[in-house]
UniProtKB/Swiss-Prot annotation:
Native source organism of the sequence: Hahella chejuensis (strain KCTC 2396)
PTM (free text): Phosphorylated by CheA. Phosphorylation of the N-terminal regulatory domain activates the methylesterase activity.
Keyword tags: Chemotaxis, Cytoplasm, Hydrolase, Phosphoprotein
Name this polypeptide is given: Protein-glutamate methylesterase/protein-glutamine glutaminase 3
GO cellular component: cytoplasm
SMART domains in UniProt: REC
SUPFAM superfamilies, A to Z: CheY-like (SSF52172), Methylesterase CheB, C-terminal domain (SSF52738)
InterPro entries given in the database record: CheB-like, CheB_C, CheY-like_superfamily, Sig_transdc_resp-reg_Me-estase, Sig_transdc_resp-reg_receiver
Function statement: Involved in chemotaxis. Part of a chemotaxis signal transduction system that modulates chemotaxis in response to various stimuli. Catalyzes the demethylation of specific methylglutamate residues introduced into the chemoreceptors (methyl-accepting chemotaxis proteins or MCP) by CheR. Also mediates the irreversible deamidation of specific glutamine residues to glutamic acid.
Length: 349
């Protein structure tokens, strides 16, 4: 696998080169800014690009836009900063077509170095398999028309959704943003979200969502009762569950767990405590986290929705749900929001 490193720091480029080559991949070039990156890509055509955000001449955002317009290539944003400003820029880079964001390893002497290295290498290997498409900039002021949603299919008497549970991973932040932008403030029940995201990035991600979401977004706290018309994100390193009174429970994950928080754990608690009176959604993501539990919820009669493969970055989680016959509807994020807006307001817990 051929990797291009784009970072304005020679020290970071050297560190990333060492990590990537020790991981069995080939570094085919280095660039200190976006202009150099575009020249290198035109000549060498890497399989994956690691992209810094802040660089002179051309930053990571503009470079990613240009790359996805001219030479579509899987991009992983590698950043050392989790400030709100950088979170907003990182989300814009994802909207431009980058696949995911991961932390820069902090040097061999740092206690989390080995974990960060393994996370970076795993991310590079995984995104190399993603089929990216050419992205063109949307004209300012031009909004996509959202088709009307399908009717909420009441297959049983007394459908009363008490909770909306959403699972997402790679590609999920942008999909979640699009969904939350379209959802009504009159949403009849709490919205609980498990989004796989790099450790340390969640607080800024939450603040970024609050800038675009129609509903207030916060990080769930142990013992908190989830309220209608609010969105709760699972915290870093904790599985989030919910009981039948919508009280949030947090369970610390083991350090060696690959997925924590887990969509499966959230969906299992929803199945146990709400059964048919739940709405569950799987957005873009690698793997199959939550798919089997969505199938069980579908069997119980819950309203189950998977993101349309035409709109996902990675069709792992929603695609697996569709394969299992677990998705009652397969929709784009704006149409998912439109469908959620059709839920009966009086059915709230």
């Amino acid at each position: 696998m051929d990797v291009l490193i784009v970072d304005d720091s020679p020290v970071i480029r050297q560190l990333l080169r060492h990590i990537i080559e020790e991981g069995g991949m080939r570094v085919i070039g280095e660039a200190s800014n976006g202009v150099e990156a575009l020249r290198c890509i035109a000549r060498r055509r890497p399989d994956v690009i690691t992209m810094d955000i802040h660089m002179p001449v051309m930053d990571g955002l503009e470079a990613s836009r240009r790359i996805m317009e001219e030479y579509p290539t899987p991009i992983v944003v590698v950043t050392a900063s989790y400030s709100l400003g950088d979170a907003v820029t990182a989300m814009q880079v994802l909207e431009a077509g980058a696949i995911t964001v991961t932390p820069k390893p902090q040097g061999p002497s740092h206690p989390d170095f080995e974990r960060d290295v393994e996370s970076l290498l795993r991310t590079i290997r995984l995104i190399s398999e993603v089929k990216v498409v050419r992205r063109f900039r949307r004209r300012q002021g031009k909004r996509e028309e959202v088709q009307p949603p399908p009717p909420v299919n009441h297959e049983h008497e007394g459908f009363q959704p008490g909770v909306i549970a959403i699972g997402a991973s790679t590609g999920g932040p942008v999909a979640l943003k699009e969904l939350l932008q379209g959802i009504s403030r009159k949403t009849p029940c709490p919205v609980l979200v498990v989004q796989h995201i790099s450790p340390g990035f969640l607080t800024s991600f939450c603040e970024w969502l609050n800038q675009v979401s129609a509903l207030p977004v916060s990080i769930g706290e142990y013992g908190e009762r989830a309220e209608r018309g609010r969105v709760y994100l699972a915290p870093d390193g904790c599985h989030m569950e919910v009981d039948r009174s919508c009280r949030i429970s947090l369970v610390n994950g083991n350090r060696d767990e690959t997925l924590c928080p887990s969509v499966s754990r959230l969906f299992s608690s929803v199945a146990k405590n709400f059964g048919r009176n739940a709405v569950v959604v799987l957005l873009s993501g690698m793997g199959r986290d939550g798919a089997a539990e969505m199938a069980e919820l579908h069997r119980l009669g819950a309203l189950t929705i998977a993101q349309d493969p035409a709109t996902v970055v990675v069709n792992g989680m929603p695609g697996e749900a569709v394969k299992l016959g677990a998705a009652r509807h397969v929709l784009s994020p704006p149409r998912i929001a439109a469908l959620l807006n059709e839920l009966p307001v009086q059915s709230c817990v």
